[in-house]
UniProtKB/Swiss-Prot annotation:
CDD domains: GT2_HAS. It comes from Homo sapiens. It catalyses: [hyaluronan](n) + UDP-N-acetyl-alpha-D-glucosamine = N-acetyl-beta-D-glucosaminyl-(1->4)-[hyaluronan](n) + UDP + H(+); N-acetyl-beta-D-glucosaminyl-(1->4)-[hyaluronan](n) + UDP-alpha-D-glucuronate = [hyaluronan](n+1) + UDP + H(+). The gene is HAS3. The enzymatic activity depends on the availability of cytosolic levels of UDP-GlcUA and UDP-GlcNAc. This is Hyaluronan synthase 3. Its EC number is 2.4.1.212. The lineage of its organism: Eukaryota, Metazoa, Chordata, Craniata, Vertebrata. The chain crosses the membrane at residues 16-36, 45-65, 378-398, 409-429, 441-461, 474-494, 516-536.
Length: 553
C-alpha cells in the first residue's frame, strides 16, 4: 500500500477515533444515564462517572506495568553496557538563586558519565547577572578544561555597538568556547529561555550524539545521564526521554509540599502510562535528553515557532517534545533517572506558574493533534480526555451550584474527595510512602485555583514572557488572582442562589445533608491534623529537606 494512502487512512482513522471518544463522553454527560440510584436520586452512579473511573483504572494499570518494565530493565544492568555516545548537558540560567545554582553545578560535576560536556548559558549579560559567572568559576572554573565568554549579543539580536562583522565573530567565539571546553559558560544579551536553549544547541551543532537539558535550579542524580542514555540507545525509535522530577524545597511551605505529591503523580502515573505507549507529551525542562541528530533537524522551526501570528516564548520544553513526536519518534519516561528542582513556595508565584503551563498545554495540544496518526491510539484518547475534562468539570460545577440542591453540591464535594483519596491510596501503594495520602488535598487546590487559571490561560494565551520569574525577583503580578476571585464569587453566588430558591428539606434529605456535612467535616479535620502532625513540623528544617542522597552537594 502506498505510503501516502497509509498516512491518509491513519489520519482519517485517528480523527474518527478522537471524535468517537469526545462524542461518547459528551453523550454520557448530556444524557446523565444512571446505572443505579436511590429514591429521589439522593445517591446515584451513572455512565459518565463510570467512564471517568475506568479511565483512572486503565491509566493506573499501564503506569504500574511501565514501572515493572523499568525494574526489570534495572535488573538487567549486569549485562555489558552498550557503546555510549557523547553527551552534552545544557543548563539554562536566569536570575537564579546563588544557592540553587551552586547545587546545580556541583551536581553536574558529580554526574557519573565520562567526558560529559557541560554548557551553561546565562540569559543576561549585565552587571547584576555577573554573579552567575562568578559561581561558575567557583564550582567548575578551576581547571584548564573550563571556558567562558561574555557576549554583547545573542544569535538573533545584536547588542549595542555591534557590527555585522563583530556579531559573526561573537557567534564563532561562542561555538569555539562551547566545543573546545569541557565546562563552558556563555553570558549573552537577554532574550528569554528559548534564546538561551537555542544558543547552547546551535553552538554544539553536531559535535555530540545526545543533548541533556537542565534548569539552573535543579540538582541532578549522579546516575541520571546514563539512565536516560540507556533508554535512547536501547531503542533507535526513541527520540527523547525524561526522568523523575522531584521537589528540592518541598518542606518550605504548604504549596511546595502539595506540589511535591502532585509532581510524583504527574510523572510516575500519568507520564509513566504515556511512556508505556511511547508517547510522553512533555519531557520536563529540569531533566530530559534528546537525540541531537533530531534536535538539529528542527532547531530553527522550534525556535521560530509562532501561534496566532505571535512568536512563542514559553512552553519551550513541551514544544521540543512535540517536535520529536512530529517526526514519528517515540518519547519515553524513566523513573531510574532522577533530579530535584525548586518549586514556588508562595501561592501567587505558583498560580502564575500554573497559568503559564496551562497556556503552553492548550497551545501545544493543538499542535500535538496534527501527529496523532503517527503514534499509538492512546495518545489520541488521552489528549481528548485530559484536554476536554476541565470544561466538563466547570459545566458540572456551575450546573450544580445554580440548578441543583444543597445536597447535590455537598455530594459533588464528597465525590471529589473520594476520587482524591482513591488516587492517593494507589499512589501510597505504588511509591511506598504514606505522605502520598495528602495528594487528596490537592483536589481542593485544583477546584479552587487551577480551573479558573486554565480558563484565564486560554483567554490570554498569546501573552508571553520568560517564564516563572527568577528566584531573585519578587513576584508582584496579582493579575492571576482576578480569575480565581471571579470563580469564587460565581461559586458563592450559586450557593446563595440555590439556598434561597430551595424548598424546605424533606426528612430524608435533611438526614443525608447532616450526615454528609459531618463526614466532609471529619475528613478535613482528620487530614489537616495529620498534615500538622507529620508535615508542618518539618517545614523550615533544612536537614529534612532532602529525601535523596544526591541532594546534599
Amino acid at each position: 500500500m502506498p505510503v501516502q494512502l497509509t498516512t491518509a487512512l491513519r489520519v482519517v482513522g485517528t480523527s474518527l477515533f478522537a471524535l468517537a471518544v469526545l462524542g461518547g463522553i459528551l453523550a454520557a454527560y448530556v444524557t446523565g444515564y444512571q446505572f443505579i440510584h436511590t429514591e429521589k436520586h439522593y445517591l446515584s452512579f451513572g455512565l459518565y462517572g463510570a467512564i471517568l473511573g475506568l479511565h483512572l483504572l486503565i491509566q493506573s494499570l499501564f503506569a504500574f506495568l511501565e514501572h515493572r518494565r523499568m525494574r526489570r530493565a534495572g535488573q538487567a544492568l549486569k549485562l555489558p553496557s552498550p557503546r555510549r555516545g557523547s553527551v552534552a548537558l545544557c543548563i539554562a540560567a536566569y536570575q537564579e538563586d546563588p544557592d540553587y545554582l551552586r547545587k546545580c553545578l556541583r551536581s553536574a560535576q558529580r554526574i557519573s558519565f565520562p567526558d560529559l560536556k557541560v554548557v551553561m548559558v546565562v540569559d543576561g549579560n549585565r552587571q547584576e547577572d555577573a554573579y552567575m559567572l562568578d559561581i561558575f568559576h567557583e564550582v567548575l572554573g578551576g581547571t584548564e578544561q573550563a571556558g567562558f565568554f561574555v557576549w554583547r549579543s545573542n544569535f538573533h539580536e545584536a547588542g549595542e555597538g555591534e557590527t555585522e562583522a563583530s556579531l559573526q565573530e561573537g557567534m564563532d567565539r561562542v561555538r569555539d568556547v562551547v566545543r573546545a571546553s569541557t565546562f563552558s559558560c556563555i553570558m549573552q544579551k537577554w532574550g528569554g529561555k528559548r534564546e538561551v536553549m537555542y544558543t547552547a544547541f546551535k553552538a554544539l551543532g553536531d559535535s555530540v550524539d545526545y543533548i541533556q537539558v537542565c534548569d539552573s535550579d535543579t540538582v541532578l542524580d549522579p546516575a541520571c545521564t546514563i539512565e536516560m542514555l540507556r533508554v535512547l540507545e536501547e531503542d533507535p525509535q526513541v527520540g527523547g526521554v525524561g526522568g523523575d522530577v522531584q521537589i528540592l524545597n518541598k518542606y518550605d511551605s504548604w504549596i511546595s509540599f502539595l506540589s511535591s505529591v502532585r509532581y510524583w503523580m504527574a510523572f510516575n502515573v500519568e507520564r509513566a502510562c504515556q511512556s508505556y505507549f511511547g508517547c510522553v507529551q512533555c519531557i520536563s525542562g529540569p531533566l530530559g535528553m534528546y537525540r541531537n541528530s533530531l534536535l538539529q533537524q528542527f532547531l530553527e522551526d522550534w525556535y521560530h515557532q509562532k501561534f496566532l501570528g505571535s512568536k512563542c516564548s514559553f512552553g519551550d520544553d513541551r514544544h521540543l517534545t512535540n517536535r520529536v513526536l512530529s517526526l514519528g519518534y517515540r518519547t519515553k519516561y524513566t523513573a531510574r533517572s532522577k533530579c530535584l528542582t525548586e518549586t514556588p513556595t508562595k501561592y501567587l508565584r505558583w498560580l502564575n506558574q500554573q497559568t503559564r503551563w496551562s497556556k503552553s498545554y492548550f497551545r501545544e495540544w493543538l499542535y500535538n493533534s496534527l501527529w496523532f496518526h503517527k503514534h499509538h491510539l492512546w495518545m489520541t484518547y488521552e489528549s481528548v480526555v485530559t484536554g476536554f475534562f476541565p470544561f466538563f468539570l466547570i459545566a458540572t460545577v456551575i450546573q450544580l451550584f445554580y440548578r441543583g440542591r444543597i445536597w447535590n453540591i455537598l455530594l459533588f464535594l464528597l465525590t471529589v474527595q473520594l476520587v482524591g483519596i482513591i488516587k492517593a491510596t494507589y499512589a501510597c501503594f505504588l511509591r511506598g510512602n504514606a505522605e502520598m495520602i495528602f495528594m487528596s488535598l490537592y483536589s481542593l487546590l485544583y477546584m479552587s485555583s487551577l480551573l479558573p487559571a486554565k480558563i484565564f490561560a486560554i483567554a490570554t494565551i498569546n501573552k508571553s514572557g520568560w517564564g516563572t520569574s527568577g528566584r531573585k525577583t519578587i513576584v508582584v503580578n496579582f493579575i492571576g488572582l482576578i480569575p480565581v476571585s471571579i470563580w469564587v464569587a460565581v461559586l458563592l453566588g450559586g450557593l446563595a442562589y440555590t439556598a434561597y430558591c430551595q424548598d424546605l428539606f424533606s426528612e430524608t434529605e435533611l438526614a443525608f445533608l447532616v450526615s454528609g456535612a459531618i463526614l466532609y467535616g471529619c475528613y478535613w479535620v482528620a487530614l489537616l491534623m495529620l498534615y500538622l502532625a507529620i508535615i508542618a513540623r518539618r517545614c523550615g528544617k533544612k536537614p529534612e529537606q532532602y529525601s535523596l542522597a544526591f541532594a546534599e552537594v
